[in-house]
Amino acid sequence: MTIHLRSSAVRALIALIFVLALGALFNAEGAFFKWDTHRDMLRHISVFGILACGLTLVIITAGIDLSVGSLLGFTAVLFALLSLRLELSAWLAVPACLAAGALCGCVSGGLIAKFRIQPFIATLAMMVFARGMAKSISGGQKITTAILRPDGTYHYADVPGVFAFLNSKILGQNIAVVTLIFLLCILVCWIILSRLRWGRYIYAVGGNEEAARLSGVPVAATKILAYGLSGFFCAVAGLCQAAQELQGDPETGISYELTAIAIVVIGGTNLMGGRGGIGLTFIGAMTIGYLEKILSINAVGEAGRLMLTGAIIVGAVLFQKYRK
């Protein structure tokens, strides 16, 4: 396990260095060497990185979670509904959203562990269900405090303090709060995988489920835990997304799962399960973040970025299969 993680980390770091070299080479107007570029990249990739934290746990169990983007959208809308429309306290709204995300994840995990439904099918169903829930509770409309001015611009009135905090910057306006939340999620996952018994269970289930069961590992509970944590991290990302947009949009989060999966696999976590680590996911997030920033600086459109993301996922899977 340790040897695999070290070799995967080396390959992930090589990929990151290669992307940084591309940034230095294709450096439109010197933008890549400005701190604002790196700060904005960290802020942008943090939401995807939080999603990838939960996905890492799921993928190590040899599973997959296609619902992360929709769960982000659902919890973002729920947060806006509770905070902006119903004007509930953050002490009620935040735990409610986190619990809703974790519950949805546990439902997916239960379908997989107890009813033997394939992860792809179970999480695909949850993806559709969560998107429907987002549209249902919002009436298909954005939930916002935005007021349209006569000049065509928007004024955001009565923004709750929790929205302002999640959308703020600290340390002299250099680090976004969402970036610190991403780093905290990385730390939590590291503790789970490296210091807790459940972390060993997650690796055991992904490595050989039947052997883990015969060894006394609670396989079903481990899977439900992994998917429940994935749903929890989706909710964390949803809160951050709603705060950044100052609204709850039922369409937000579409295709986010692609970027989150790309982050995990480019870091080196094996899609077949049993191998990987949260440190690899952090490196993968930096790699994808810088790659997207380089493409943006050089005026590559969203279509090109999506195609590249798909190619990265396929390439990483083929590389893992070749090594195996």
Regions found by a protein language model. Give the residues of each.
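Transmembrane helix-bundle core of multi-pass membrane transporters
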Residues: F120-L196, T222-L225, E245-P250, V300
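Helix-loop-helix "hairpin" substructures at the membrane interface of multi-pass membrane proteins
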Residues: S89-C97, L103-S108, I112, I170-Q247
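Cytosolic-side transmembrane-helix boundaries in multi-pass membrane proteins
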Residues: M1-L22, G207, L214-A221, L291-K324
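Transmembrane alpha-helical segments in multi-pass inner-membrane proteins
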Residues: Y227-G228, F233-C234, Q244-G310
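Hydrophobic core segments of alpha-helical transmembrane domains in multi-pass membrane transport
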Residues: A12-L25, L55, V128-A134, T179-I191, ...
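N-terminal, non-cleaved signal-anchor transmembrane helix
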Residues: M1-H44, I170
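Hydrophobic alpha-helical transmembrane segments
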Residues: A9-I14, M41, F48-G49, S70-F74, ...
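Single transmembrane alpha-helix segments in multi-pass membrane proteins
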Residues: L20-F26, K34-L86, G110-I117, A262-I278, ...
